[in-house]
């Protein structure tokens, strides 16, 4: 083993590490950045006086005065009456203030942004590959969900169907396949 070169890892470091002539310098690979936007960003206009209370209401953190006095802030919970599950596994409509998938009036766009700080070659054997972690679901994935405007007070609910269909249940008693009933019903 012939030492031909010394490498210092930190500029101010006095310790040096010896390096073999056949060795190569390996730099750390910068991970790919993947940002998936499901909802369009919403612009909220406010003045300087109300900015702090707006941020606290959006993040759910209490105001400084409430934290010092020990008073608990009342959480706003949406209560809906529980409806019984139907035997025929039909979709159930519920009243809601649910805005998760219905924000911005159903005007959804899915946008992927890719980027990396360094486009050098990578050693995929030593680093965990995140490519397979998020599967490409295709364009038709989100079209299977019912989208309504935010002015609507109804949200489509789906009942988990554990018996495929009532007709198939008699024929295949031992078959325990599961599926979702995703028939769209317009209740407006």
Curated annotation (Swiss-Prot):
Residues 161-179 have a biased composition (Low complexity). The keyword Transmembrane does not apply. InterPro entries: VQ (IPR008889), VQ_8/17/18/20/21/25 (IPR039607). It is found in: Nucleus. The keyword Nucleus applies. GO terms for cellular component: nucleus. It holds the Pfam family VQ. Its main location: nucleus. It comes from the Eukaryota. Residues 1-20, 58-92, 157-188 are annotated as: Disordered. Keywords: Nucleus. One of its GO terms (biological process) is seedling development. A motif (VQ) lies at residues 51-60. May function as positive regulator of plant growth. Plants over-expressing VQ18 show stunted growth phenotype. This is VQ motif-containing protein 18. The gene is VQ18.
């Amino acid at each position: 083993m012939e030492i031909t070169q010394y490498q210092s890892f930190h500029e101010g470091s006095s310790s040096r590490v010896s390096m073999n002539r056949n060795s190569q310098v390996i730099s750390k690979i910068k991970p790919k950045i993947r940002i998936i936007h499901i909802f369009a960003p919403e612009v909220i206009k406010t003045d300087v006086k109300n900015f702090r209370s707006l941020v606290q209401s959006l993040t759910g953190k209490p105001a400084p005065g409430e934290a010092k006095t020990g008073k608990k802030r009342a959480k706003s919970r949406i209560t809906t009456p529980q409806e019984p599950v139907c035997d025929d596994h039909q979709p159930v409509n519920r009243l809601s203030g649910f805005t998760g998938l219905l924000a911005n009036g159903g005007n959804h766009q899915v946008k992927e942004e890719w980027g990396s700080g360094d486009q050098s070659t990578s050693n995929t054997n030593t680093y965990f590959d995140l490519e397979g972690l998020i599967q490409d679901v295709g364009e038709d994935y989100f079209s299977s969900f019912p989208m309504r405007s935010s002015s609507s007070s109804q949200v489509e609910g789906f009942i988990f169907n554990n018996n495929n269909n009532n007709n198939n249940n008699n024929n295949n008693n031992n078959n325990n396949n599961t599926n979702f009933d995703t028939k769209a019903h317009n209740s407006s």
